[in-house]
A protein has these predicted regions:
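Hydrophobic alpha-helical interface/terminus motif in multipass membrane transporters
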Residues: 24, 81, 85, 94-97, ...
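Transport-system extracytoplasmic interface segments
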Residues: 1-80
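Transmembrane alpha-helix boundary/anchor motif
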Residues: 19, 76, 80, 89, ...
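Hydrophobic alpha-helical transmembrane segments
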Residues: 5-23, 86-98, 119-127, 176-192
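Hydrophobic alpha-helical segments typical of transmembrane helices
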Residues: 3, 23, 81, 92-93, ...
């Protein structure tokens, strides 16, 4: 009696995991057929045990929902702070603020704090919608999600304010933000796996903040990964947050 074969696929990305599983099964079938000297493919139902880890039903929504959450964070915590600053430039109220005795750091902080609060509220609502509408609940700790979300919100809001400091009109701000948002969506692993990209593109993703947050969300939601195991992602997001917020304060005029 032949030994049983166990095949386990990483099904976080349902499409990629399913295709990889089929390739492996077909390869095994052809190999067994050649070894037995048979013309028809061997029947693998009694020999092979197939297991899809992290996403047993191969539901593609489980892969996409975290990406949609991040896109929502970028639109709310990225677009709105930039438009707020540029809107005050166009209306002239920014000049009145500049003559007040507050420091640039306090002004930047006053612009960021409301969007930090809104962002954390959006995280809560997004998780509730994912649970109630799509039946997707995090396997890991919710604290890991909130910690990553806070760092990402700090990063994207500081990034948007930096862009606003170099923009003169709302139209200019929207065009620049749209360019970066499309780059984030296409190159950060939100919609397509980073592993399937060319080598140069994979290296380029290392400087894109959403890459690290989408790994946090998918790992916590589907794998149950802990905060300690995601420390490199948190460190990267914290570094981006520090750099962009310092740039936002230094470039403000």
């Amino acid at each position: 009696t032949p030994e049983r074969i166990s095949i386990t696929a990483n099904a976080v990305n349902a499409t990629k995991g399913g295709m990889g599983m089929q390739y492996v099964v077909q390869t095994i079938a052809r190999t067994l057929t050649e070894l037995r000297g048979e013309k028809s493919p061997a029947k693998l139902s009694e020999l092979v045990t197939i297991e899809n880890r992290y996403n047993p039903t191969l539901n593609y929504r489980h892969y996409m929902i975290p990406a949609l959450m991040i896109i929502l964070f970028i639109l709310i915590c990225g677009f709105l702070p930039a438009l707020s600053i540029v809107g005050e430039k166009e209306s002239g109220t920014i000049e009145q603020i500049n003559v007040t005795p507050i420091s640039r750091f306090m002004f930047i902080l006053s612009k960021l704090v409301p969007y930090w609060i809104i962002g954390l509220f959006v995280v809560t609502v997004a998780m509730l919608v994912a649970r109630l509408v799509y039946g997707l609940a995090p396997v890991g700790s919710i604290v890991a999600i909130y910690f990553g979300a806070l760092l990402f919100i700090l990063t994207i809001s500081g990034f948007s304010l930096t862009i606003a400091n170099f923009s003169e009109t709302m139209q200019q701000t929207m065009f620049v933000m749209f360019f970066f948002i499309m780059t984030f969506m296409l190159m950060s692993g939100l919609l397509t796996p980073i592993d399937s990209m060319p080598v140069w593109a994979q290296r380029f993703t290392l400087i894109l903040p959403p890459r690290y947050f989408v790994e946090v969300l998918r790992s916590v939601y589907l794998k149950g990964t802990t905060i300690a195991e995601l420390w490199t992602n948190y460190a990267a997001l914290g570094t981006f947050a520090l750099i962009f917020n310092i740039l936002a304060a230094l470039t403000y005029k």
